[in-house]
Protein backbone atom coordinates (compact mmCIF):
# COMPACT_ATOMS: atom_id res chain seq x y z
CA UNK A 1 0.00 0.00 0.00
CA UNK A 2 2.48 2.61 -1.18
CA UNK A 3 -0.15 5.30 -1.62
CA UNK A 4 0.05 8.86 -0.37
CA UNK A 5 -3.14 10.30 1.08
CA UNK A 6 -4.43 13.44 -0.68
CA UNK A 7 -3.07 16.71 0.72
CA UNK A 8 -5.23 19.72 1.48
CA UNK A 9 -6.15 22.12 -1.29
CA UNK A 10 -3.75 24.97 -1.96
CA UNK A 11 -4.35 28.33 -0.31
CA UNK A 12 -3.20 30.10 -3.46
CA UNK A 13 -4.89 30.24 -6.84
CA UNK A 14 -6.86 33.50 -6.63
CA UNK A 15 -6.37 36.90 -8.14
CA UNK A 16 -8.51 40.01 -8.51
CA UNK A 17 -9.57 41.38 -11.88
CA UNK A 18 -7.53 44.31 -13.16
CA UNK A 19 -9.27 47.67 -12.64
CA UNK A 20 -7.99 49.35 -15.85
CA UNK A 21 -6.78 52.47 -14.07
CA UNK A 22 -4.68 55.20 -15.65
CA UNK A 23 -4.73 58.06 -18.10
CA UNK A 24 -7.35 57.56 -20.82
CA UNK A 25 -6.88 60.85 -22.72
CA UNK A 26 -3.45 62.43 -23.07
CA UNK A 27 -2.25 66.05 -23.16
CA UNK A 28 -3.16 67.93 -26.33
CA UNK A 29 -6.06 65.63 -27.29
CA UNK A 30 -9.36 67.23 -28.31
CA UNK A 31 -12.18 65.59 -26.37
CA UNK A 32 -15.94 66.03 -25.97
CA UNK A 33 -17.63 66.93 -22.67
CA UNK A 34 -18.21 63.91 -20.43
CA UNK A 35 -15.10 62.04 -21.59
CA UNK A 36 -13.13 60.23 -18.91
CA UNK A 37 -9.60 61.64 -18.70
CA UNK A 38 -8.13 59.61 -15.81
CA UNK A 39 -9.28 56.66 -13.71
CA UNK A 40 -7.41 56.61 -10.41
CA UNK A 41 -7.44 55.54 -6.77
CA UNK A 42 -7.25 58.68 -4.66
CA UNK A 43 -6.32 62.10 -6.04
CA UNK A 44 -2.99 61.33 -7.73
CA UNK A 45 -4.01 64.02 -10.23
CA UNK A 46 -6.30 66.88 -9.17
CA UNK A 47 -9.07 68.44 -11.27
CA UNK A 48 -8.38 71.89 -12.74
CA UNK A 49 -10.48 74.19 -14.95
CA UNK A 50 -13.47 72.53 -16.63
CA UNK A 51 -12.70 69.12 -15.10
CA UNK A 52 -15.00 67.29 -12.69
CA UNK A 53 -14.26 64.48 -10.25
CA UNK A 54 -16.50 61.45 -9.68
CA UNK A 55 -16.97 59.73 -6.33
CA UNK A 56 -14.31 57.14 -7.26
CA UNK A 57 -11.86 60.01 -8.08
CA UNK A 58 -12.34 59.60 -11.84
CA UNK A 59 -11.57 62.86 -13.66
CA UNK A 60 -13.83 63.82 -16.57
CA UNK A 61 -14.25 66.74 -18.98
CA UNK A 62 -17.06 69.22 -18.25
CA UNK A 63 -16.71 70.99 -21.63
CA UNK A 64 -15.45 70.17 -25.13
CA UNK A 65 -11.80 71.11 -25.51
CA UNK A 66 -8.13 70.22 -25.33
CA UNK A 67 -6.57 68.28 -22.43
CA UNK A 68 -3.81 70.14 -20.57
CA UNK A 69 -1.67 68.65 -17.77
CA UNK A 70 0.25 70.95 -15.39
CA UNK A 71 2.31 70.66 -12.22
CA UNK A 72 1.84 73.51 -9.75
CA UNK A 73 2.60 74.58 -6.21
CA UNK A 74 4.48 73.04 -3.35
CA UNK A 75 4.13 70.16 -2.88
CA UNK A 76 4.28 69.58 -6.64
CA UNK A 77 0.64 68.87 -7.45
CA UNK A 78 -0.42 67.43 -10.80
CA UNK A 79 -3.58 68.94 -12.24
CA UNK A 80 -5.47 68.38 -15.46
CA UNK A 81 -7.64 71.02 -17.07
CA UNK A 82 -9.58 71.45 -20.29
CA UNK A 83 -8.94 74.44 -22.54
CA UNK A 84 -12.28 75.06 -24.33
CA UNK A 85 -12.06 74.63 -28.10
Swiss-Prot record:
Pfam families: Ribosomal_L27. PROSITE patterns: RIBOSOMAL_L27. One of its GO terms (biological process) is translation. Keywords: Ribonucleoprotein, Ribosomal protein. The keyword Ribosomal protein applies. GO terms for molecular function: structural constituent of ribosome. GO terms for cellular component: cytosolic large ribosomal subunit. It comes from the Bacteria. The keyword Ribonucleoprotein applies. Residues 1-24 are annotated as: Disordered. Belongs to the bacterial ribosomal protein bL27 family. NCBIfam families: L27. HAMAP family: Ribosomal_bL27. PANTHER family: LARGE RIBOSOMAL SUBUNIT PROTEIN BL27M, RIBOSOMAL PROTEIN L27. This is Large ribosomal subunit protein bL27. It comes from Nitrosospira multiformis (strain ATCC 25196 / NCIMB 11849 / C 71). The lineage of its organism: Bacteria, Pseudomonadati, Pseudomonadota, Betaproteobacteria, Nitrosomonadales.
Amino acid sequence: MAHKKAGGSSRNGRDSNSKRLGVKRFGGELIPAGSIIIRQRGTRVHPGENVGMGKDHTLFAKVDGRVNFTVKGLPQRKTVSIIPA
